[in-house]
Amino acid sequence: MSSTDDRRFEVLRAIVADYVSTQDPVGSKALVERHNLGVSSATVRNDMAFLEAEGYIAQPHTSSGRVPTDKGYREFVDRIADVKPMSGPERRAILEFLESGVDLDDVLRRGVRLLAQLTRQVAVVQYPSLSASSVRHLEVVALTPARLLLVLITDSGRVDQRIVELGDVLEDEDLSRLRALLGGALEGKRLAAASIAVAELADESPADLRDAVIRSATVLVETLVEHPEDRLVLGGTSNLTRNAADFSGLAGFPGSLRAVLEALEEQVVVLKLLAATQNSGTVTVQIGEETQVEQMRGTSVISTGYGAAGTVFGGVGVLGPTRMDYPGTIASVAAVARYIGEVLSER
């Protein structure tokens, strides 16, 4: 890349930094005064004219300054050399806050609240997908001699409880045998394999336990093949009102705050945006029209997966106006996702 291209990118970077910070269109004079670009005002004006002609910046109708376009933000994000990592104390504070969660629901709620506070944007976390989980443990509890409570615990920390009505009374010794049979078929297996294993268990079980096994297996298969991952925790929507001007259609940004709020109410829209994240090692940035959601054309979505040992439990991310602190937000999303995965995998 030529020195001219590098210089023009520095001008673009400075425009992005100033506009994100001030929300005011940026002029060449301000750039020269605020940034050590090492060139004259005339050169900066020429570079800005080039950036505008190429579609990286645009001129709002009401100002002589320029603002970044979606294309400009994309160029900026793609050329971020280093995302400033969080400090040791910041990382410890995040981990300690999440570790204080009493269960899966609490950990995810804490994660959303924390991410919304760190980024001052809308934060969203997807509940762990059962299809990507493994069975850590199955507990079988006798509520009465003819009624059982099955407690299924996955490696992502998800807990599902189901009631089984038995045809006959089950003695304590038989309960232990049933617990061993079901646990042996399920524990350590991915849920898809576990559902097959437990469905086949009836043919292999002792005759005196067959009815209890069939009834338990029926309930477990229903649990294992459900898809409760279509659940989200959302937080920080009040942050949208702080940035309401960004959704007013000014500066060439289409859409409105109302349209964004309506889109957030449709979980399928948010799940689609999180679906762009396929692993827990990469942060995905979708800017403006890249979201492919009409109501979200004035927004950016920064997301990644959370999980452990190479398994993605679900997605986590933030949504806000395209005018956002991309380096800081990327770092926050990555850190919170990492520690949510660590906390859940240790439970």
From Swiss-Prot:
It comes from the Bacteria. One of its GO terms (molecular function) is DNA binding. Belongs to the HrcA family. Negative regulator of class I heat shock genes (grpE-dnaK-dnaJ and groELS operons). Prevents heat-shock induction of these operons. Gene3D superfamilies: 3.30.450.40, Heat-inducible transcription repressor hrca homolog, domain 3 (3.30.390.60), Winged helix-like DNA-binding domain superfamily/Winged helix DNA-binding domain (1.10.10.10). GO terms for biological process: negative regulation of DNA-templated transcription. Keywords: Repressor, Stress response, Transcription, Transcription regulation. HAMAP family: HrcA. This is Heat-inducible transcription repressor HrcA. SUPFAM superfamilies: GAF domain-like, Winged helix' DNA-binding domain.
